């Protein structure tokens, strides 16, 4: 049997062959299902979509399966997650905007109890169900201590009503975050099931931690006599831009040529890859007309792009770990793999987006100068 992979852009589906024989065939031969969701991944951020970023594992899946060129999404962010989990339009699922209660039908900020999740359906039909990663479909009102935790760890008992946690919406287990944005080295709202994780070990990086957990669970599922459904939702490459030094080093010179050169090179590769067949026209003008050579923060921006690339690189490395675990345990040939992003790349922190200096060195989003200690207390 062929395994099936789907990369959705961002989207993709693939067929490959496992080198390992199934170790102890299960009596229930329905396919395992692995859904992998990236966060704010751009259309051209993968090698198989023209990127200079090193993504060999996802590129291999794309080559073996189906790569989508016209995969559209009617929502974004947490509304995407609500739709993906329920098969409903985001308003029907209860999250028409974000995870804040606007006190309007369709805008309650929490996954509706009337919306059945795919995990609930598959669990009822005999699947083992697991979630690893970012939830972001439960109302998480910001309290002062939570805001402080984004910069400095302050323990808080719960991050939304427990009835809305993944383990109470069809998942047998969940390791990951409830909230939508975290410090990658000290993540806010990290839980194991319903229990907050108070401390993380030295050298912790959430992207790697999620990959490690997913690979471990894949190996454990090989011992069970039923298929599994795993929803792996990475936080990367959503801001804040935080990556491991060894990954950043790979790209420290890549983006010094500037965004125009990178954009044009990606487009040329996309044409060569057949993503835009028969199109010889030039790219449309960029939304912002500032030229790289006139950019006073070129060094800063080149570094930021390098960190962004490093975050994606680490996601791909993790997916390689998971594929290896599937192959080693003889499960790859009977696993459906889907990879997609909740939306395209984020433009929230671009210079001049709102007529002010956004995300510049030592500046706030409204252009005010800030001074703060570089080390977390």
What residue spans do the PLM features occupy?
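Short, low-complexity interaction segments enriched in Ser/Thr/Pro/Gly
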Residues: 1, 18-23
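Bacterial N-terminal signal peptides that target proteins for export
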Residues: 1-7
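Hydrophobic h-region of N-terminal signal peptides that target proteins for export
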Residues: 10-19
């Amino acid at each position: 049997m062929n395994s099936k992979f789907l990369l959705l852009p961002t989207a993709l589906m693939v067929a490959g062959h496992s080198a390992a024989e199934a170790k102890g065939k299960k009596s229930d031969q329905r396919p395992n299902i692995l859904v992998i969701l990236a966060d704010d991944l751009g259309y051209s951020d993968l090698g198989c979509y023209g990127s200079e970023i090193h993504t060999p594992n996802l590129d291999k899946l794309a080559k073996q399966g189906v790569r989508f060129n016209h995969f559209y999404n009617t929502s974004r962010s947490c509304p995407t997650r609500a739709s993906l989990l329920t098969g409903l339009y985001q308003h029907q699922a209860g999250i028409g905007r974000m995870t804040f209660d606007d006190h309007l039908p369709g805008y309650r900020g929490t996954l509706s109890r009337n919306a059945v999740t795919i995990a609930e359906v598959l669990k009822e039909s005999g699947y083992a169900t697991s979630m690893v990663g970012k939830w972001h479909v439960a109302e998480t009102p910001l309290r002062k201590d939570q805001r402080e935790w984004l910069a400095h760890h302050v323990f808080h008992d719960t991050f939304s009503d427990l009835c809305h946690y993944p383990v109470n919406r069809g998942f047998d287990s969940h390791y990951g975050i409830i909230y939508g944005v975290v410090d990658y080295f000290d993540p806010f709202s990290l839980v194991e099931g319903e229990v907050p994780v108070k401390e993380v070990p030295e050298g912790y990086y959430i992207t790697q931690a999620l990959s490690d957990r997913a690979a471990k669970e894949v190996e454990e599922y090989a011992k069970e006599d039923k298929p599994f459904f795993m929803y792996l939702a990475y936080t990367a490459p959503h801001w804040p831009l935080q990556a491991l030094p060894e990954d950043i080093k790979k790209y420290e010179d890549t983006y010094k040529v500037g965004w125009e050169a990178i954009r044009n090179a990606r487009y040329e590769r996309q044409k060569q890859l057949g993503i835009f067949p028969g199109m010889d026209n030039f790219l449309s003008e960029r939304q912002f007309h500032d030229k790289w050579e006139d950019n006073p923060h070129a060094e800063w921006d080149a570094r930021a792009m390098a960190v962004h690339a490093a975050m994606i690189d680490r996601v791909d490395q993790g997916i390689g770990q998971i594929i290896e675990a599937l192959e080693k345990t003889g499960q790859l040939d009977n696993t459906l793999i889907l990879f997609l992003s909740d939306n395209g790349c984020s433009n929230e922190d671009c210079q001049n987006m709102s007529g002010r200096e956004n995300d510049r060195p030592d500046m706030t989003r409204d252009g005010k100068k800030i001074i703060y200690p570089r080390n977390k207390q």
